[in-house]
Amino acid sequence: MENISDLWNSALKELEKKVSKPSYETWLKSTTAHNLKKDVLTITAPNEFARDWLESHYSELISETLYDLTGAKLAIRFIIPQSQAEEDIDLPPVKPNPAQDDSAHLPQSMLNPKYTFDTFVIGSGNRFAHAASLAVAEAPAKAYNPLFIYGGVGLGKTHLMHAIGHYVIEHNPNAKVVYLSSEKFTNEFINSIRDNKAVDFRNKYRNVDVLLIDDIQFLAGKEQTQEEFFHTFNALHEESKQIVISSDRPPKEIPTLEDRLRSRFEWGLITDITPPDLETRIAILRKKAKAEGLDIPNEVMLYIANQIDSNIRELEGALIRVVAYSSLINKDINADLAAEALKDIIPNSKPKIISIYDIQKAVGDVYQVKLEDFKAKKRTKSVAFPRQIAMYLSRELTDSSLPKIGEEFGGRDHTTVIHAHEKISKLLKTDTQLQKQVEEINGILK
């Protein structure tokens, strides 16, 4: 086995790809490998809080990553600096992942126990993908086969794939379910050729009931692996076995992917997942806090949700970073503390250019007004007042002229825009509820 420091550095590089940036920066980056004795890898964490968190949240992922790198089933122990001198004491290590047992052809325990349909937060950006995944889980190979889910990093594709696997196994314990990444498929295929075990490899993946394969875009350019996966796909599909595939883009946009594979990916259902809206981001944070037994003020939830809008991993990682920071400096969690905790991971980006459309959408989200109603002739208070707020913000946050603003609101006269701006400006001086609503809208627009 390679030098222990080199091994751990290699593991950290892989772990950095698998967790959010905040999680990596907070929990993993500062760890070091202490020693390796009798198949037990001892990792040094910076403090007790980090050690306990790593043990409860990352030991399984670390075991899996090390197994992928070395092929060895290593147990994991976490220590803190002052306990290094005592590392020879026979303390019970974290048990290696049972999925690493070579006798288990079907690594069902590779499924993350936290990734179920019950823990998935449904929002406008993932509702259809969730419904399709549930339909596939309830009736494998009868609903959509294959199911192709695509979207950006950390949006929930892997969560849905694991949820499908859990559901199938729960309702049919004898089902053969395999989850793996396309990278692992490629590595195992290459190893099978090198070791003259191609038949074993094919039997392993062509005799399953459900194949869940993640990040299929990494097959691009790998001609031999694509050839092998093509035949694996055909074998499973012909036997009415379910195939679920994920990617960061739709099949037609994956470069150097063979047309015959592309067409097969399009046989079933293709569904996408988009970044969560503010409401969904807050719901995700609340669910994460509840799952971890954390009491987080609403103002902190809103702050984090406004600052982190890229993906769910970053969002949850930011929440945990805030909690860790609060614990380490022994201060209560509030918005100011959250800002301090996240200052290093929230990039100082250029000021966002806000359009009138952005404003209409944000105001519409807060006041439950359809976009078309901003341009309509409706004068009911439920529409007219939000329209005036949107006009006010368009005047405040964009460089658009009065006539241009009026045009974007159904061709209204510039005097209407002036009146709306004056009215809302006056109300904001005394109306605390309106102040909060406008603040919420501004948060969405950041």
UniProtKB/Swiss-Prot annotation:
Residues 1-81 are annotated as: Domain I, interacts with DnaA modulators. InterPro entries: AAA+_ATPase (IPR003593), Chromosome_initiator_DnaA (IPR001957), Chromosome_initiator_DnaA-like (IPR020591), Chromosome_initiator_DnaA_CS (IPR018312), DnaA_C (IPR013159), DnaA_dom (IPR013317), DnaA_N_dom (IPR024633), DnaA_N_sf (IPR038454). Coiled coil: none annotated. Keywords: ATP-binding, Cytoplasm, DNA replication, DNA-binding, Lipid-binding, Nucleotide-binding. ATP binds at G154, G156, K157, T158. Residues 327-446 are annotated as: Domain IV, binds dsDNA. GO terms for cellular component: cytoplasm; plasma membrane. GO terms for biological process: DNA replication; DNA replication initiation; regulation of DNA replication. It is found in: Cytoplasm. The keyword Electron transport does not apply. It comes from the Bacteria. Residues 110-326 are annotated as: Domain III, AAA+ region. Residues 81-109 are annotated as: Domain II. Disulfide bonds: none annotated. Its main location: cytoplasm. The keyword ATP-binding applies. Plays an essential role in the initiation and regulation of chromosomal replication. ATP-DnaA binds to the origin of replication (oriC) to initiate formation of the DNA replication initiation complex once per cell cycle. Binds the DnaA box (a 9 base pair repeat at the origin) and separates the double-stranded (ds)DNA. Forms a right-handed helical filament on oriC DNA; dsDNA binds to the exterior of the filament while single-stranded (ss)DNA is stabiized in the filament's interior. Belongs to the DnaA family. HAMAP family: DnaA_bact (MF_00377). Oligomerizes as a right-handed, spiral filament on DNA at oriC. Domain I is involved in oligomerization and binding regulators, domain II is flexibile and of varying length in different bacteria, domain III forms the AAA+ region, while domain IV binds dsDNA. This is Chromosomal replication initiator protein DnaA. It comes from Bacillus cereus (strain ATCC 14579 / DSM 31 / CCUG 7414 / JCM 2152 / NBRC 15305 / NCIMB 9373 / NCTC 2599 / NRRL B-3711). The lineage of its organism: Bacteria, Bacillati, Bacillota, Bacilli, Bacillales.
